Each structure stands twice: as structure tokens, then as C-alpha cells.
Amino acid sequence: MRPFLDDAKRRVDRKLSASRQSLSTSRLLPSALPDRLKDNHDAQVDFTAPPGGSGSREGHLQYMQQSIFGMIAAVGSRSDFHARFDESSDSDGESEQRPRKESSVRKGTSASANTSSPLDSSQRSSSRTDGKSEKESGTRGRRHPRTISDHKLFRPFESNSKHEPQTDPSTGDEMPNISPPTRPRSATPRAAPILSRMVEAQAQFDLKASSTERSQPSLDESGEKGPRGASVSPLSTRLMDMFGFDKPEKVLVEYACSLLQSILLQGYMYVTEGHICFYAYLPKKSTVAIKSGYLYKRGRKNPKYSRYWFSLKGDVLSYYADPSNLYFPSGHVDLRYGISASLGEAKEKGREPRDFQVTTDQRTYYFRADSSMSAKEWVKALQKVIFRTHNEGESVKISFPIESIIDIEESPMVDFAETFKIRVIEDDDSYAIDEYFFTFFNSGREAFEFLRSLINDQSLKISSQHLSPQPDRSPRSDPTRKSRNRWSLTSGTSRVLGNSRAETQRKASASTSHTSLAHDVIKSSPATRHQDSSESILNSFEQGTESSAAWQSMTDAAESASQILNRSDVFQSPTIHGLDRRPSGGERRGRRNSDETARSLSTRANVGTGQQIDELGRRMDGDTSGREARDSTGESDQYTQDPTKSFSGAPSLNELVKAGVYPLQRAAGLAEYLRTRSKQMSNLLASESMGYIEKVSGMWTGGRKHYGEAEDVLPDDQDVDPEDKEDGCNYGDRFRAHFALPRTEKLQATYFAYLHRVLPLYGKIYVSQKKLCFRSLIPGTRTKMILPLRDIENVEKEKGFRFGYHGLVIIIRGHEELFFEFRTSDARDDCAVTLHQHLEAVKFMAESGLLAEQEQNDSEAAMTEHRMLQEARYDDYGENDLRPLNESSELHPIFDDPRASIVNFKPAESLRITCLTIGSRGDVQPYIALCKGLLAEGHRPKIATHAEFEPWVRKHGIDFAPVEGDPAELMRICVENGMFTYSFLKEASQKFRGWIDDLLSSAWASCQDSDLLIESPSAMAGIHIAEALRIPYFRAFTMPWSRTRAYPHAFAVPEHRMGGAYNYITYVMFDNVFWKAIAGQVNRWRKNELGLKATTLDKMQPNKVPFLYNYSPSVVPPPLDYPDWIRITGYWFLNEGSDWTPPTALCEFIHRAREDGKKIVYIGFGSIVVSDPSALTKTVIESVRKADVRCILSKGWSDRLGDPASAKPEVPLPPEIHQIQAAPHDWLFSHIDAAVHHGGAGTTGASLRAGVPTIIKPFFGDQFFFGSRVEDLGVGICMKKLNVSVFSRALWEATHSERMIIRAQDLGARIRSEDGVATAIQAIYRDLEYAKTLARQRSIASSTPFSPTPSAKTTAEQDADDDVEDSEEWTFVGDDTDMEMSRRLRDRAISDADMLPDRLLANSVPGDSGPGRKLSGR
């Protein structure tokens, strides 16, 4: 595993060293630019300004303010609320604070480096310098002045645990020293456990007490393993090593089966000459959500149930008030400390319960599901997680002697599998009987018959040995039975050595934090007992209060104290440790039982008197069976009856010192108990290091802290949070307890800041290896935020909302921005630098479920053990005789994989699919790609668009239907007015009212004979045509059109980030403004030609329509608040480059530039309107020369719709620029180093797919949106103005910024791996039934025949129609969310899918030929 980690680190080092620069922003510093690229006199001039105003040349006319939303933003920017968005925010903290930021980074790096030895520091620094810096400087030929601390970047990913030697010469103990991740006492004080609750929990788990209660394995110390002769098979040898047999045993037979407990464990059963063994390999993943959904939760004090969205991921059950805001949990249940999960009692007879509860060591949580089946599923999932957390590891091993088996009987549970039960006697002392259930999906009858015959042969022997035992038989007389009959869940690193002492077989089952099912066999060795007895004095001083409660609960338990204590995860460590927290290595190994297993009864028995123990034994003799009594004496009396076993020899000096400081420790323990248990006493006691007022004042002063590898504060950081130093608690423990994070999550830095949501909320920011967390500090608030760093796209600095504060914006994938405010610019800048450092580190580190190096090693070891076992099987039987587990034990379909679908969504018949769109070439091209995919699927697609695209469409074998409208004229309106702005709609309604009428009528005619309609919403007619034809209707578009808080509407992108509320309102306003502008003409058209009644925006419900977005989820991640009928499929690319032959002149120009060592850029703004095309051409020429690059130019701004008044002679092009007329993007962009264009959806997708940095100069429409996305992703630059100063600097940065180049290449690789057309087709299949349901709802609401001419109606019929219109039967009403409604509609659609043709036929008028007929009126 180490070589893999080293290689990964070297790869990341190589990528990061190439992009060494300031991390406070995503752009290069001005100091890194050549002097020739400094600002000139034209820095504020925009040569791409449209005609129509003299002020445009001075840059005062902004394109976004041509929209109605731009006017709102322009007016609002004059208020104090938008003062933070002034242009000075771009330079705030940039030039003045950069030296300070750099020095702080260097200072933090040096401080952290000083914590290690000078030799280590010198070695690390030399290796970094020689291995990365010099190599990169030699290969790249340049070095950026800003550097990143590699030590800070990659320190968190290394394991911090120091592995202790696993052998002690004095004791011969080989048990590893693994410290459990105990919960911080100050954060979560642990109450005295109630043993009866744990007994009930174990019964509900179906983990029988006897199955986990094993006697200590005892082997003859002088005995040796049997010789491994030449006849011993590899499988026998492997089983001997894995299960600790004395000698290799011949394998008689093996079966693939499953162990049935509270969960189903798939594995193998091996039947040897003396044992029946079971082995299951359980790889774990902690980053995948196991289950999620809505549940009701009861409050701690309020009996009312509240509805939350729950998500079970890893070891934590989190719940959220809003399922679309998963970064702000309302709370969580840490299942690492869980005891049980069980169903509640049924409140009504004959009805199964919907309530269930989860019990932890702190409290019991009560939940209520929507149905009894859902409650059962949740309980099953929770039991599985608790089972795994209590028994941490990656393999399950069970073995029991054949002679201990009492009987075997069938236990049928399901029809498709054979299940039988094996009853086994545990040992001679307790006579306990274990029951094991094994399920076979194949060969079950054969296995049952074989085992039954094997057991019957020894039935008399078993009866004589176990039912009539000899009273004087010692446990050591039969070592086989007691040492083999055990259950363990172990990681691959835990091996049982047969020739070692009995103590060596008690190695920790799990390599991480918790005890395993084998913890009942882990007992103290003599050396350990001696250390525990001395330590118990100190424990008794601080645990007196809890011990008394524990004694009382022990006497009332249904099982013996030793049994529960040895199997309890709650007793894994003392609640209050001793004051001496730095024991020596030998002491740590001697006291490992207090860290890895439950604190045994011996530690308290040494404190109590012999009378207490005797009284406890008498109570247990009277209340329990002989088994419990024997266990209690076996576990406790052996330590108390002979005190010399615990206190052998004279007391050591260390023990005398501990006993001497008893008064101080007693007082400290009492103060600790009162402080952690009582809020009132904590306010009264003056035991803290500073007063309450001083502590609060320190918190409100704000500040920052950085933490080293051991999570200690670096010396240069001021101490502003003295609470962290209290309780002897590690700095990171409190952080992990607040957010229920694993031990592998190491704290890196903390800051005090305000989080702006509705109101500013003061709290603390935590930065760890892979998380950004926030916790409110205002009394009465419980806001918490857990944000994975991999979900953060960028971090930007802005002015604060309030005067004197400094803002920081966190841009999140698929989520609205988060705004933080800091009191000082230093803290804000330091936080920005720290976040950028961690973002760079996690950028190329793919997160898996195994984060820590130790966990990776353990997983590798378990996987190696599993692989070696498989190899041994194949060596014994050959590949033809054995089938792998995944084939031989395949689950029945009742155990359905949620990731796989059980329904074939592809329709059986070929569909007639019409794609309706208007606009430019970029609007039509994606539909050609989609239709080519539909043709390959056997469907009959057709594209309805402008007539000038007909040859292009038909060239690809796609049917075509014309739609009225001149795209050139439409382009002129869009450029001059902004796309779908108020001025656009006003001019269109005045000058193009007839154009809209022709568009609607021609679209209606073109969409006839269709079974499915897919429309760009800009065409305006599709939803009404689908309602009239009563066919399923989809929408598809190249820009965001659905309401979300993550992104603003593509036509209303603000100058600065406005937050989620503004983003959402832009969609609402646009929908209403757009509909108001066309409502009159559309309703007239509906009545006259479609035969439909007038409609409104509420009746249409456009937000319920299934939507396909043809851009990449890597470019525009799906927002968390999108319903499940909205899908981002990926780009629909039309690859035409393979059929295109480039001109010779173009190839020679590219070849010449490569020989000269010059970068090549493409510049083309498409068909735009500018006031002075010649001036724009001159600007491009000067910028190319100034940036010292070569240019391939596509000059569309002077070819179409130019201003005749500005016509001037063409400017001659220098040899550095080669002009082309047209070239396929997929070919051209693969031969350049950077692309400059207008930011259209198709062109942006093509340049990003090629993996080249992209410079965007937006003009109108969605171009502003994609420009902002490119800049947020760090793969390009969005220019607000175009002049020589700005353009030349952007060209140089795009071709020289290694950071931008690497990000663009990474994004391009992800886009090329997508198949947007195939994903879109599958989305159509999946949502087709849902779309049919919506069509049925609309047809019921309209209930009018397909006739453009209204038929004569009676008064009653007219009144009935009016009732239908008023009722709005198909409008969604209620509190259901979109996702809930979609699920209900899907369920209804599945049951009613076959009714649609009959209903459509019944609703049609006589003589109709069906939905696809043409209207006679046309």
C-alpha cells in the first residue's frame, strides 16, 4: 500500500508544483505578468459595445443591464445592501495583503516544521526541493514566485498513529496497542450504563449471548502444531492459520452460504475433519448513503413528532429540515455509540407498528415511519450499522467443533432458499447452547443431508460428553473444544497463531476503534492484571459515583456481570481517566484492556471488599442459572480470592506516588464530575483556567488557530478559545464530537466568523482534512454545517454586508453560495489561503471510504487474506470444480440491488419523436446529435425548425419540418435588446406580432403525427401542442431554465453574487414576464386552431414537465433542489471533424507556430453586432501581438447585420493571425492552446471538452452564465470588457497559467468520458410514463375534442366546460414536495399505463384517426 500512496503523492506534487502561485484567488497575480501587459489608457474601453449610444465606448453600458433584472440590480446597487459589491472588492486585500498572506503561510509552514527534529526537517525539505521544484523548473523553464507549502498540503493525509511494537519481552504478549476513539468526556458525558438495556439489545440483534461468550482459548504451552506434511492441502493449511487449529485438518466439503443473524452475511462454509467453519469477507465503505428518506422524530422533551429528511451514511444517522440543503443538518445520531434499534409496540391490534427507537449510551431516540414496511427497513439498516460499528473489521470467522454439535434441523423461511439451524454446546462450564442459522440458495439439501449424517455419527459421543460431564474435569483437559468454539469478526491483520500462548490468541478483533464480537474471549494476562490493579486505584478515585450505579445495575441484570462487561461496547474505556496521561510503552501495553475492551470487573473488584463480591455472587446465585454464577466466579473471584495475583511483590514507587496524591485526585475528580454533569455547577465552580467573562470576551474578539500534526496549536497563533484546553481533551476530539466525524478527520484550523443566511449568525469555522464545518455560538441556536471540501468549487473574497467587515464567498457544486463575514481582513485572507491549499490537495485525491493509512493497510490485509483463501480453494479443487461466491450464492430477486432497475423502460414499439426548436445553428446542432441516437434506437425522429437548416438536417438522415421565422432577424433583436428581456418582448410584440402568430401556426402543423414531443422552451408552442395532441411532452435546453437556488436564471446573471433567494426569484419573475408578453396571442391561437380553452401559467404547471439539460454535470452540477424529473445528461456533441479536411494553409500555419514555440489561440465571437467592427479587429490584432501568441481568427462580427454607418475598409491581418471562415470545433479545438469566444452553450462545451483554457466575452443571453461558470471552475476567464489591456493579459494568462491548464485538462477528460446522448435517451425512457401521466391529467382538464372549429354546444355542456375550467383538476395542490408528487405519479402511471389508449379513444370525436391525425381545418 505504501508504494501506491507514494506514487499518488508524487503525482499530486507534480501537478501542484506546476501551479505555484498565490492561492487567495484563482487568477494570476499582476506581479506575475510581464511589464508589457500592464494596463494602458484603454483599460476601461469596451470595443465590443453595441451600437446605439455614445456612452457605450466608455464602458458604461453593461449587457446584463439590458434585462429587466439588470435594471433592478442597477437600482439596488445604490443601496447599502449592495455596497459590498463595489468594484473595489476585486482589489480589497489583494495588493496590500498579499505579502502578509505569503509570510503567514511561510510562517505557519516553518512553525509546523519546527515541531519535528531538525534532521527530519532537513530531509523533508531537501527531498521536496530536489524531487519537485528543481525538476519542474527545469522542465517548464519558469517558476512562479508564489509557492504552496507541500508540508501543509499533504500532512493531513498521512496517518498520525505511531505503531507500538507488538511483542513485549517481559510478557510475551503480541496484542497490538490500539487506542479506541473514545468520545470526549466534556462534550458528551457518559452516564452509567444500564445493563438490562444491553441485554435486551443483544436479544433484538439475534446475537445470542452464548454465541459471543467464549472461554479463553487454552492451548498446551508445550504443545506444538502438527507437522505440515506433503499431503496437507493448501486450503487446510490456510484454514489452520485463519482459525487457529492445532494441526491442518482435511477439508471434507465446502459450500457457499449465508449466515443469518440480524443481517445476512454471505460467505463460505468449510467442513473439516473436526470443525465446521464459516468465513465472510466484508469490505466497508463509509461514503455511500445506505438509506435515506422521510421520518418523524420525537423531541427530547417535546412529545410531538416532527418530520425530517434522514440520511444514514457511514456510522451517522443525520436528519435535515430540508432535503435540498444537506450541508446543514438539524442533528445527528452517532451510531458508534449505539446499543440497539428496535420496533415499537403496535398501538392498534391487527396493525403492525410504525414506530421504532434507537438507543445509544446517551439517550433513546424515537422515530415514526410512514408505513410499517418502511419502519422495518429502517430498523434493519440501523441494526446492520450498529452491528458493524460494534464489531469493526472486514471479515467474519466462526468455527465450532463437530463433537460440540447437538443437532441440526430445517428452519424454512423463504421458498427460494434452504435454511437450517445448528445447535452447539458452548463449553463445559456453562452448558450454554448456541444456535446458528445458515441459508443456502444453492445445494442446500445436499449440505443438510451431509451435515446431518456427520452429526448422527457422533450423537452418542456428544450426549455422553456434554450432558453428563465429570465434575472434576478441568478446562485444560479438552483444549480443542473451548478454543475452537468461538465467533470473531476480525480484520485481515489479526492472525491467530497456534503455537503461541493462550494470551496471544486474544488479539484485537478490529484494527480501528471498537471491540469485536471476539471481545468476550479477550481477558487479562497476568502482566496485564498487575498493571490494571494498580491503575484501578486511580480509576476508583474518579469513578466512585458511577461505580455505585453500575454495581446496582449489575445486580439487576439478567446475565452475569462478566458476560455483559466483556461484550459491552459501552465499557470500552473509563469515563474519567487518571491524571497521569503519558504512561510508558510497557504501561500502555499492560493496560490495553482498558482501551480495547470493556473495563473488566477486576478493576472494580480490587477496589471493593470481599464481602461485596460475595454478596454479589449470592444475589446472582439466587436470581440466575448456574451458568451465570460460574461465569461470575470465573471472572471475578479469581482476582479477589488470591490477592497476590493482583498485587504481586512490594508496591512500586509509581504506585506509592499515586496513592499519595489521592486527596488532589479525589478533588479533581469531583470537580470534573460536577463540571461535566451539571450546567449550574459549572457556572458556580471556579475550577476553570479563566473566568466566564474573560472566556466569552476572548471568543468574541475573534481570531484564528492553526493546528499541527498532533492537533496542537502552532506557537504563532493566539489563544482565543481557552475552552479547548480544558478537560485534558485533545483539540480535535471536541471538533469530531460536535460533528460526529471519524477519528481520521484531523483538525487543521479554526476561525471565528459570521455565517450569513437569513441573519448573520456568529460561530466558529473548522477546517479539517476533507471537511469545512461551522457551529453557531449564539445561545439558543443549534446551526451546524458540514461541507465536504470536494464539493467546493472556488473561494472568493468580497466586501462584507456590513461596514467594517470582510466577506468570503464559498462557491459550492450544485448549491447556493455561502457568505461568511470576518472582523479582520487578516483572518479572512488566512481562511481563504487555507481553503485554497486544501482544495488543491483534494483536487486530485479521489476520496474513497478508506481515508486513513491504517485503514487502508487493514483493508489490504483483509483483502489479501480473502484472496489467499480463494487461491487455496482453486489449488485444491481446480477452477472447474468450484464456482465463485458471486455466482454460486446469487441472491434471489427479493434482495434487489437498489442501483439496478427491475423494469425495462425502453418502449416495445418505435416512436415518432418530434424535436421543436428555434434560434441559431447552435440551437439546432444538439438536436441533430440526439436524433441520430434515436435513429440508432429504432425510432423515427423529426426536427422542426427554421427552413434554412433543412439541408443540414436531412444530410444526417433525419426528417425535417419547417417552422416560420428568420433566425437572422431574431439574432438582431437578441443582440440589440438582450435575449427575452423586456425590450426584446416589447419589440417582438410590436413589430413581430405576426411573426409570433406564424411561428405558433407553423409549429402546430409541423408537430402532427407525433408520439412524443421534445421542445426547447424558447419555441413557446410545445406545451400547448402536446396538450392538444395528448402526447407526452419533454423539454430540453442548453441553459438553466428550472427554478433553483443554486444558479440564477441564465438571462439574469448579476454583476456580483446575490445568494440563493435572488437566484430563485429570477426564475419566478422571468416566467411571469415571459408569459404575460405572449399570453394573449397564445390563448387566441389555442382557441382558434388547437380547440383548447384559454390557460394560465398556474394551469400549465411548466415546472412539472420532465426536463433534459444538454450540458455536462461537471460544468453545471445538478442542484440539490432539482426534482428527479429534471436531468442533466451531458453535452449532445455532433462529431463532424472526422469528415472534414482542413485547408492546407491552416495546417501550415499551425505547423509553423509549433516550430516557433508559440502558443496558438482561437478567437471567434460568432455573429454579433458591434458599433465599430474595424476597431474590434484592431484590438484583436494588438492584443495577439502583445501577448506573443499565434491566432486563428473567425471574424463573424463584420459578416452579418453590421451597422452600415460604421462600414470601413478591412484591416489587413499580420502574419501572426490566420483567418478562417468555418471549421468543426472538435477538430479545431484539439489543435490549439486556448479558445476565445462569446460563451454560447455549444461553443463552450466544445472548448471545455478539448481541455483547453477558455476566455469568454459574453454579449447577451446565456453567455454571461457560462462565462461565470468557466471562471468559477478555474478553467478560464470571463471578460466584462474587451480592450488591448484586458484582452492581452487574458491571452497570456490562459496560455501560461499551469494551474488553469491542468484544471482545463482534467475537466476535458471528464467531459469526454460522458455520453450525453445515451444518457438523454435513457432519461426519456425512464420518464416516459411520468410524461404520459401529465398528458392524461391535461387531457382530463381540457376535455375538448381535436377540432380547430368549436362545435355547437348546449347550455348544459357549456356550463360543464366552465366547471372543468374552474376546478383545475390537474393542478397540484397540497404540501407535497415535487419529489413526493413525482413518486406518486409514477406509481399511478405504472398501474394506469394500459388505460391511456382506451381513454384517448373514448375522448376523441367520431371519425378521429387518433392523436397523430392531421387536422382537416388546416
Curated annotation (Swiss-Prot):
Pfam families: EryCIII-like_C, Glyco_transf_28, GRAM, PH. It catalyses: a sterol + UDP-alpha-D-glucose = a sterol 3-beta-D-glucoside + UDP + H(+); ergosterol + UDP-alpha-D-glucose = ergosteryl 3-beta-D-glucoside + UDP + H(+). Keywords: Autophagy, Cytoplasm, Glycosyltransferase, Lipid biosynthesis, Lipid metabolism, Membrane, Protein transport, Repeat, Steroid biosynthesis, Steroid metabolism, Sterol biosynthesis, Sterol metabolism, Transferase, Transport. UDP-alpha-D-glucose binds at S920, R921, D923, A1223, H1225, H1238, G1242, T1243, D1262, Q1263. GO terms for cellular component: phagophore assembly site membrane. Residues 1-16, 35-44, 95-105, 127-139, 147-166, 578-598, 615-633, 1380-1391 have a biased composition (Basic and acidic residues). GO terms for biological process: autophagy; carbohydrate metabolic process; lipid glycosylation; protein transport; sterol biosynthetic process. GO terms for molecular function: sterol 3-beta-glucosyltransferase activity. It is found in: Cytoplasm; Preautophagosomal structure membrane. It is an enzyme of class 2 (transferase). Residues 1358-1379 have a biased composition (Acidic residues). Residues 289-387 form the PH domain. InterPro entries: ATG26_PH_GRAM1, ATG26_PH_GRAM2, EryCIII-like_C, Glycosyltransferase_28, GlycoTrans_28_N, GRAM, PH-like_dom_sf, PH_domain. Residues 116-126, 508-519, 1341-1355 have a biased composition (Low complexity). SUPFAM superfamilies: PH domain-like, UDP-Glycosyltransferase/glycogen phosphorylase. Its EC number is 2.4.1.-, 2.4.1.173. The keyword Lipid biosynthesis applies. Residues 249-288, 733-799 form the GRAM domain. Belongs to the glycosyltransferase 28 family. The GRAM and PH domains are required for the localization of ATG26 to the preautophagosomal structure (PAS) and are involved in autophagy. Sterol glycosyltransferase responsible for the glycosylation of ergosterol to form ergosterol-glucoside. This is Sterol 3-beta-glucosyltransferase. It comes from Neosartorya fischeri (strain ATCC 1020 / DSM 3700 / CBS 544.65 / FGSC A1164 / JCM 1740 / NRRL 181 / WB 181) (Aspergillus fischerianus). The gene is atg26.
